[in-house]
């Protein structure tokens, strides 16, 4: 990509003297290793100041990296210092930008030690700002943005508070998989399905611990939610498949990598309806009046906000997988040693705020591990044409099993890890997250070999065991049955080249949270509605029970986010 971001200043910046010579005037380019590939910058200086910084080339993940690519150059130019904060959630990209700019300034003869010193400017006192709107939404992930758009569609004025420097939450980092029964399209692809089947698998897959009425709302409205997204130009692939832990092929895969398509569609819709989004603004407290939630206090970079809601507040700030203290409170063995796939903002802030106003919690002890970690990279996150083998080269589990059962089995294997084995039939140029397979191979994340003998040697497993595992799987494909009880079958693993990706479990989804009713109103400990208070998305509990099916999280965010926004807008 060329000239993605450019930042410049006019005249001398604060704290610099026009006569003080600091650099050799000119334009300088430099590179640094980014998250996905080298990142290239151009820095222009005059004798005394940094004038302009351009990001010339990068292959960073859209949405997740945008704030780092934009805000760090801007901050360096404005403050004339390299001592700027990295962007939470995009640390690798942030550091790459800083390193590249540092190298360019070295070329310009800059005193790097001096440039790394913090500005001596006194901290600016934050201004107290009071605002009023119809609906306040806390969190700009899939649920929050869905709520904001749905409320705005009803004519409500909406303000969204997002503590991170970018929208997206966990949605933008997801695999983009959306479960919805679409009988007509599924039947055309030879798939028999029904809403009843989706309900049964979701409810029983959650060990019958979910609230049946909420499960019913999810499965009955997921297709409508998908069509709603499509009305804002969201694109899905034609083929319906299944992802790990989905139990059935009803997964609609987003055409854009990861969750980028969802957030692009919702941002477009929010802009259309003039939704106000305040980034880098953390909600800190719910404002109460006679038992009703009437607003939110929040802290931004420059302002302290007190925002009043004429109608309601929707809490959609996500789960708590990135909060080690909170998750170990409910599941002690999920310590800091257990990595998470979640973004760093998933710290349960909204749950804490909700508790303080009397909200009831449900299912906090149900925390799901994802069996597909290592940043979700690899040729695929689908299971239709994959087998899992341990470090002895043996299959050990039904790959289309529930995620909790998969993780239980994986953690019993050597090092708590396994290899996902694929052949050439399902390896595209990029996977569901937009990663180029060639780049993943170059990084060593994915191992590639022309035959199984070479693949076994590449990953250090016994050749005879790997070949036997693949051979037995291929026979099972013909019979549509195997000893592990697998139910999803597609093609054999027989056409080279072959691929192996090392994976392990990581904390992925917190099923517990604020207790809600069918209208997404938050309930107190006596089961009564807390007036003016709604919630949607991973911050809520009671939908997925003790285990969430793969592909059910995104419809959860869209369906319940939309319901919350509509009902909040209808408040008198």
Provide a role label for each language-model segment.
Residues 18-122:
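Active-site- and interface-proximal helix/loop "cap" or "latch" segments in soluble metabolic
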Residues 130-160, 569:
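N-terminal Rossmann-like FAD-binding beta1-loop-alpha1 element of flavoenzymes
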Residues 157, 166-276, 280-282, 395, ...:
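Conserved N-terminal/central alpha/beta ligand/cofactor-binding core
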Residues 254-311, 351, 357:
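Helical element adjacent to the flavin cofactor pocket in flavoenzyme catalytic cores
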Residues 285, 465-547:
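A glycine-rich dinucleotide-binding beta-alpha-beta segment and adjacent secondary-structure elements
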Residues 300-302, 308-372, 563:
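Glycine-rich loop(s) and the adjacent beta-strand/alpha-helix scaffold that form part
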Residues 327-352, 501, 540-572:
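A conserved FAD-binding loop/helix module that cradles the flavin
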Residues 351-355, 360-461:
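An anion/pyrophosphate-binding glycine-rich loop and adjacent beta-alpha core
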């Amino acid at each position: 990509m060329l000239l993605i971001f450019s930042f410049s200043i006019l005249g001398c910046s604060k704290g610099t003297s026009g006569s003080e010579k600091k650099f050799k005037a000119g334009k300088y380019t430099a590179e640094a290793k980014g998250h996905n590939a080298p990142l290239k910058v151009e820095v222009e200086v005059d004798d005394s100041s940094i004038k302009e910084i351009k990001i010339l080339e990068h292959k960073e993940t859209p949405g997740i990296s945008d704030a780092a690519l934009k805000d760090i150059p801007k901050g360096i130019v404005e403050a004339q210092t390299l001592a700027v904060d990295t962007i939470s959630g995009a640390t690798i990209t942030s550091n790459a930008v800083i390193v590249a700019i540092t190298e360019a300034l070295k070329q310009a003869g800059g005193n790097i030690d001096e440039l790394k010193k913090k500005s001596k400017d006194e901290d600016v006192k934050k201004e107290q700002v009071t605002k009023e709107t119809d609906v306040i939404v806390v969190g700009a992930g899939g649920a929050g943005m869905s709520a904001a758009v749905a409320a705005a569609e009803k004519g409500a004025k909406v303000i969204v508070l997002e503590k991170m420097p970018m929208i997206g939450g966990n949605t933008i980092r997801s695999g983009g998989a959306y479960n919805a029964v679409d009988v007509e399209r599924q039947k055309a692809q030879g798939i028999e399905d029904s809403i009843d089947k989706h309900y049964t698998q979701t409810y029983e897959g959650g060990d019958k611990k979910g609230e049946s009425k909420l499960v019913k709302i999810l499965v009955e409205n997921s297709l409508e939610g998908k069509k709603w997204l499509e009305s804002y130009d969201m694109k899905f692939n034609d083929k319906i498949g299944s992802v790990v832990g989905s139990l059935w092929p009803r997964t609609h895969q987003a055409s854009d990598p990861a969750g980028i398509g969802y957030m692009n569609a919702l941002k477009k819709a929010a802009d259309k309806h003039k939704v106000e989004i305040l980034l880098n603004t953390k909600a800190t407290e719910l404002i109460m009046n006679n038992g009703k939630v009437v607003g939110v206090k929040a802290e931004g970079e420059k302002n302290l906000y007190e925002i009043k809601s004429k109608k309601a507040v929707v809490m959609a700030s996500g789960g708590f997988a990135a909060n080690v203290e909170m998750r170990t409170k409910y599941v002690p063995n999920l310590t800091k040693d257990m990595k998470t796939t979640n973004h760093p903002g998933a710290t349960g802030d909204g749950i804490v705020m909700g508790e303080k106003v009397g909200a009831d919690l449900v299912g906090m002890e149900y925390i799901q591990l994802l069996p597909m970690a290592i940043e979700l990279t690899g040729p695929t996150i689908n299971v239709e044409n994959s087998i899992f083998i341990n470090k002895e080269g043996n299959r050990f589990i039904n790959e289309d099993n529930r995620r909790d059962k998969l993780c239980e089995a994986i953690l019993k294997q050597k090092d708590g890890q396994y290899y996902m084995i694929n052949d050439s039939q399902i390896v595209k140029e990029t996977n569901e997250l937009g990663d180029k397979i060639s780049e993943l191979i170059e990084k060593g994340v994915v191992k590639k070999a022309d035959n199984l003998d070479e693949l076994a040697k590449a990953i250090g497993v016994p050749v005879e065991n790997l070949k036997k595992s693949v051979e037995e799987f291929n026979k099972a494909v013909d019979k549509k049955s195997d000893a592990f009880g697998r139910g999803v079958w597609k093609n054999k693993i027989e056409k080279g080249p072959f691929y192996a990706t090392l994976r392990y479990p990581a904390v992925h989804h917190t099923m517990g949270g604020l207790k809600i009713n069918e209208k997404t109103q938050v309930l107190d400990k006596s089961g009564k509605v807390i007036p003016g208070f709604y919630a949607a998305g991973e911050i809520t509990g009671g939908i997925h029970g003790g285990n969430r099916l793969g592909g059910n999280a995104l419809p959860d965010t869209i369906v319940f986010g939309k319901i919350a926004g509509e009902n909040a807008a209808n408040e008198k």
